[in-house]
From Swiss-Prot:
Protein name: Small ribosomal subunit protein uS17
Single GO MF annotation: structural constituent of ribosome
Any Pfam family hit: Ribosomal_S17
Keywords assigned: Ribonucleoprotein, Ribosomal protein, RNA-binding, rRNA-binding
Natural source organism: Campylobacter curvus (strain 525.92)
Gene encoding the protein: rpsQ
Family as reported in the entry's similarity comment: Belongs to the universal ribosomal protein uS17 family.
UniProt cross-references to InterPro entries, sorted A to Z: NA-bd_OB-fold (IPR012340), Ribosomal_uS17 (IPR000266), Ribosomal_uS17_bact/chlr (IPR019984), Ribosomal_uS17_CS (IPR019979)
Gene Ontology CC terms, in alphabetical order: cytosolic small ribosomal subunit
PROSITE patterns per record: RIBOSOMAL_S17
Amino acid sequence: MALKREIQGVVLQKAGDKTATILVERRVMHPRYHKFVKRFKKYLVHDEKNETNAGDTIVAVECRPLSARKSFRLKAIVAKGVE
């Protein structure tokens, strides 16, 4: 069995029942200037128990496609956001 990809990001919003939108930041080196620049991407994450709120930092793990855009499940909440 292959290892599942894990991503860590900040919850931007609750996109509906059992779904959260997270923002994942990654750092890549610019090909010409050799400086690290930030790249951002949004993912939809399945939150079975509706545990997350906006501002939380979470870890999500890859799973089978649950909808057209949702392929990650909530694994753990790393830090709670400001209430």
